[in-house]
Amino acid sequence: MLLCVEEKKKFPGGFVMTETSDLVIAAAADSVPNIALNDGNAIPQIGLGLLRIDDDAVAPVVESALASGYRHIDGAAGYNNEGGIGRALTATGYNTGERRASLWVTTKLRDSEQGYDSALKAFDRQAGLLQVDYVDMYMLHWPTPFDWRSGETWKAFVKLRDEGRVKTLGVCNFLPEHLERLHDETGEWPAVDQIELHPTWQQREVVAFCKEHGIAVEAYSPMARGADLKAGDGTIERIAATHQVTPAQVILRWHIENGTIIIPKSVHAERQRENLDLFGFALTLEEHAAIDALDGPTRAGHDPMTFSYA
C-alpha cells in the first residue's frame, strides 16, 4: 500500500484536491503496469474514466488524478467535457513536452460524426478542445450496425495515425461480428476494444475473440457502476475483509489479474488513489474463481446492436 504525504487544496464549488508528494506520485505512476498493444504501443493498465462529469467540473477531477499518479485519462466527444479536460492538461503542463509524453490521452469520435471527412473535421475540433497536438488513442464509440460507417471512418483514423496526430486506433462496444466486418473492410484489427465488463457481465465470447486476434480488452463500468460491490450475496465483501481492502479494490484487482485495462471513474481524490493502489495484495485462485462465478445474463449499460452516442 502507498504511503502518502499530503496537503489539501480547495477549488471553487467545494471540490477538495489532496496534493501528494512528488515521490509518492512517482511511485503510484510506476506501480501501474503497461499493456502491450498490437501496434507496438503500450497503454497504462489503469486510467481515469470521465463519463458524466460536467465540463465546468471536470478540470479539478483531472488535476486531482494527475496529482495522484494517473497517467491515463479516458474521454469522449459524447461526454461533452473535452474543453474542461484540456484546461486541466494545460494548467498542469500535461499538454506538451515531457509531461505530455508521459500521459496517455484517449478520446472517442461522436457517432453522428462518423464518415471520412466528418471524422477528420471532428478530430481537429477535439484536439483543439483538449489543447494537445496528438491523441494517444482515438476510438469509434459505438458500432451502430444500423448505420454502419465504421470502415469509411477507419480510413480517416488511419490518415490521422499516418500524420502522427493519433498513435493508436481503437473501438468501443464492438462485438465479434463488428470486429470481423471492420477487418474485412480495412484489413486491420483495432488495438483495443473497450467494452462493458464487470463480474456480473463478463462477455467471455467477446473477450476470447479479442484475445484470439491480439486485441486488448478495456473495461468500462468495471464495477457495474457500483452494483457489483455487493454481488454474490457478499462474496466481494468477504474477500475484501480477508485482505483488509475495499470491495472496489477487490473487483479492480480481479480485472488486473485478468490482464484487462480498466478505467474506473471517481471524482474523489481519496478514491482515485485507492483505485490505483491495487498491487499490495493478490487474490487466491479460489477467490478469483469465486468472482468468475458471479457472471450473469444482464448488462448494466446499453446494447451495442441498438445504441448510438449521437
Report the location of each language-model feature.
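Acidic-and-aromatic substrate-binding clefts and catalytic sites of carbohydrate-active enzymes
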Residues: I53-D56, A76-G84, S112-D117, P145-W148, ...
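A short, structured active-site edge motif that brings together acidic residues
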Residues: R99-E113, D136-P143, L197
